[in-house]
Structure formats: structure tokens, C-alpha cells
């Protein structure tokens, strides 16, 4: 079942999102817990941030990684020589594994893009052994100030951008309690939810601007089609918002929040 995530290659993904999932992986696993042995699954592995974090646990026997985007899978394969890791293309809504095959299943920053998150979470439970833990995390819509700064500025100046590469509203599961409800409805027990906070640090305005315009999604086509004067106006407004009244370009940091949920099969 296709996702509604528009991928534009592994390099663009790393610049726009992969670097942040690397920071989120460790606190996510601290909350989720990692089994003392056995097989685990990274469902929706992207370019491998969580997979490689799991590989830091030497007691794990095998680490499966799956993503809908073949180029992300290829990027992960190129990043590791760990013989425990097997990466393949596949659909989180139809996991290509047997029932009760895994000792842990994880999904980091994936389910808000899946067309049927309820089905995906049921699949996560299906492939878990009884008593094992599944966990997932999604960004909080209200807890992403750098992204709100960007998209709110776009919509203030270019309202017709809605639906043309610009989110028309918050994505599903990005409010408190929504992901928890999906886990509970899938039959998980002992469901727990928390908020994880990481810094999103940018070296300068270009480091902030370019990945958001030319990273994942379809906004770049809309932006490039604008008349030059409107492109310049939007970029200038975005730069002013990024600088925040400080005339000097340079590093800026934004604390960003994700909701994480875990449950027992």
C-alpha cells in the first residue's frame, strides 16, 4: 500500500529528515526498550538511522529493515557491513514476514505518512512474538517550530500553495493521544506514550532553506514555477523569520517534539 510521502532520493532525505531521525533514534530506543537477544524489525527504515542505532546492541541476533522506497534501502545497504542487517523493499501495511517472528518491532517517523496506519500497526503486532514490544514515533504538529516557521510563512505569502506541495493541515497521528489510540485499537496491552525532544540545529539560513525547498515532497516544483519577484519575496521573508531580528546569519536551533508510543503484543 503506497505511502503519501513523496521521496526524492536518499541524499535529499538525509538533508531534510534523516539527520533528525539520527538524533531521535537513541531516545526513542531508550523509551521503547531493546530485547536482550533475538530478531528485531525496523518497519519503514528510511536510510537507516534507526537500523544503525539498533546495530549498536551487540546482543541482537538479526535486524530486519524494510522501506517502501528502494533507493532508501540501497542507501542503507551502502552504509553498513553488519552481517546481522538485512534490508529489503516492502510495504509496512503488508509485512513480508511470518506471524510471531520478531522480538521487537519499531517504526520511527513513518506512520503519519502511511495511507492506513491502523493496518500498519496491526501488521506490527502480527509479526511480534507474544509478550514482545512494538513502538513507534511521529512528529508533533505543534512541536515542530522550524517546520511551522517555514510552512506558515509560505502560506501567508502564497496561500494558493495549499495542496501543491504544501501541507493543507496537520497530518494524521501528529496530535497527542492519536498514535496511542491506534496501538490500543490494534490490541496492544500496557500501551504507554511519551514526548521526546531533540534539537534541530541549522548552520545558517541556507542549511535551513534549501532542504525544505528542494528536499522531499513536491514544493520545489511550485516554488520554481513562481515569478522571480515572488520567489525573491518568499525567500527574503523566510530569511527574516529565520534570523529572528538578528541581522547576522549563522547557527539557529529549534527544540522539536515527537510523540512515542510502545505496547506489548
Which residues does each PLM region occupy?
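Class I SAM-dependent methyltransferase SAM/SAH-binding core
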Residues: 39-95, 118-119
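Conserved catalytic/acceptor-binding region of the Class I
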Residues: 118-119, 129-203
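A short SAM/SAH-binding and catalytic strip from SAM-dependent methyltransferases
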Residues: 103-117, 140
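A structural alpha-helix within SAM-dependent methyltransferase catalytic domains
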Residues: 29, 52-55, 118-125, 151
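A short acidic, Gly/Pro-enriched loop at the edge of an enzyme's catalytic core
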Residues: 93-104
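Conserved Class I S-adenosyl-L-methionine
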Residues: 2-6, 20-21, 47-49, 171-265
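Conserved class I S-adenosyl-L-methionine
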Residues: 1-38, 49-53, 57, 70-79
